[in-house]
Structures are given as C-alpha cells and as structure tokens.
Amino acid sequence: MPRRRVIGQRKILPDPKFGSELLAKFVNILMVDGKKSTAESIVYNALETLAQRSGKTELEAFEIALDNVRPTVEVKSRRVGGSTYQVPVEVRPVRRNALAMRWIVEAARKRGDKSMALRLANELSDAAENKGAAVKKREDVHRMADANKAFAHYRW
C-alpha cells in the first residue's frame, strides 16, 4: 500500500444566489458539456416555480424534495465462495445526497414536459409530495435491501 499522503476531497463553492453547497452540487450534476450558467438558470427557474407552488422558500422546498428521495440503505454485490450475494449496506450521508440528486435529475430528463426547468420543477414537486419516478427509485432500492436482509451478516 502506498505511503503517500491522502488527498482530501475538493471543496465545492456554494452557489451564488442562495449560498448553498448542496444546490451547487445539484447544478453540477445537472450541467451538460460544462455549460454551468445554463444549468444554473434551469435550476433557479425550477426552484422559483416550486416555491410558488409550495408556498415555501426555494431552499426549503428543495430540501423537502431531496429528503423524500434520499435512500437510507442500498445493496452491494459481495462474492462469497463462488456465488454473489446482494448485501444490504447503509448509505453514507454524502452518497445519500449524491444519489438523491442524480435520481431527481435522471427522472426529470425522462419526463415529457416542454422545458427542462418545468420538468425539474414537476419532478421536485412530485418528490416533495412523495410521488414521482425519483421516489419510486428510492422505494425500489429499499425494497431490494429489505428482500436481501438475510445476507446482512456478509457486510464488511
């Protein structure tokens, strides 16, 4: 094992409008081909629409939607003596956020609404109400972990 120093994670700069690191990460996940300003305008328009619908502030509404999509457990493949088991493991907080944001963006991209801002706003409002494709994805992951609870002792 190398004895070099461990490289720390890069610090992500908070987004300019709300000063939230979580929102900056969300913009980065949404961004395509390095077009950050386009991604930011999509996210801000979506949050504005979401805030009007929910009657909460933009960040509160975003946080509620993200909360409903965050997974607590997931399955990881573990090979034991020739057979592979799906072992349920708890998700680390950073990965929890990353998965939730990725699932929301993927679900929004698959929607058939007019603009991406509208698709994202609809997906976020669905997530805030515990419905939609991103929430379904979380339920599926939890169901898989629940079904494979018998292999939890293989955790490492």
UniProtKB/Swiss-Prot annotation:
Which keywords accompany this UniProt record?
Answer: Ribonucleoprotein, Ribosomal protein, RNA-binding, rRNA-binding, tRNA-binding
Which cysteines in this chain are paired by disulphide bridges?
A: none
One Pfam family cited in the UniProt record for this chain: Ribosomal_S7
* GO biological-process terms attached to the record: translation
**UniProt keyword Thylakoid present:** no
Does rRNA-binding count among this protein's keywords?
yes
Which CDD domains does the UniProt record give?
uS7_Bacteria
A GO cellular component term found in this entry reads: small ribosomal subunit
Query: Which Gene3D superfamilies would you find in this protein's record?
Result: Ribosomal protein S7 domain
InterPro entries registered for this protein in UniProt: Ribosomal_uS7 (IPR000235), Ribosomal_uS7_bac/org-type (IPR005717), Ribosomal_uS7_CS (IPR020606), Ribosomal_uS7_dom (IPR023798), Ribosomal_uS7_dom_sf (IPR036823)
MF terms from GO for this chain are: rRNA binding; structural constituent of ribosome; tRNA binding
Q: How does it assemble?
A: Part of the 30S ribosomal subunit. Contacts proteins S9 and S11.
Similarity comment: family membership: Belongs to the universal ribosomal protein uS7 family.
Q: Which NCBIfam families match?
A: rpsG_bact (TIGR01029)
List the HAMAP family.
Answer: Ribosomal_uS7_B
Q: What does this protein do?
A: One of the primary rRNA binding proteins, it binds directly to 16S rRNA where it nucleates assembly of the head domain of the 30S subunit. Is located at the subunit interface close to the decoding center, probably blocks exit of the E-site tRNA.
The protein's name is Small ribosomal subunit protein uS7
- The record lists the organism as Proteus mirabilis (strain HI4320)
